[in-house]
Amino acid sequence: MIKLCYDVTDYRRQIRDVINDGDKVIELGCHTGNTSKVILENDVDLIAIDNSPEAGKEMEKLNLTFINADVRLHETLSQVFKLIQRCDVLAIDLGGGYHPDTVFKVFYIWSSTFKPKHTIIRNRGLVEFYNSVSEVSGDYESEDGFLDSYKDSGIPPQIKEFDLWTPMPKK
């Protein structure tokens, strides 16, 4: 199941609704751990990733695996894949108002790799897009936290479009 919201209170409620003891959870965009604390109310294995400078010190205080990295990078995906190959819950909050195209690409890459049962995404642009659609043609629907149309694709290759938005720093 895929859930979408903008309000952070709704985001945390949606996470609480789907999480169970024993789940393997990947949290993309943990910042300083406020949502991580909600996730850790259950007995779960949590891998939290964020590239903000404030994240590291706060995340060290919590019982989880923290990776200080950019979730848009293929190297980050590979680093997490070495730790686990599947997850039960994928939580994505890249700032709430962050560019919806980037958030969708991150969702696509991470969910197609880890095949979560549930994905929760916090992003205003995606909510606005969803609520603005006046007609949908085609009978495509997914029951899990990833799109069925790419369920057998494995780890996707690096998406070259990311370089158009966030080019690698020059040496």
Where are these regions (language model features)?
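Conserved SAM-binding loop
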Residues: 59-60
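Conserved class I S-adenosyl-L-methionine
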Residues: 22-31
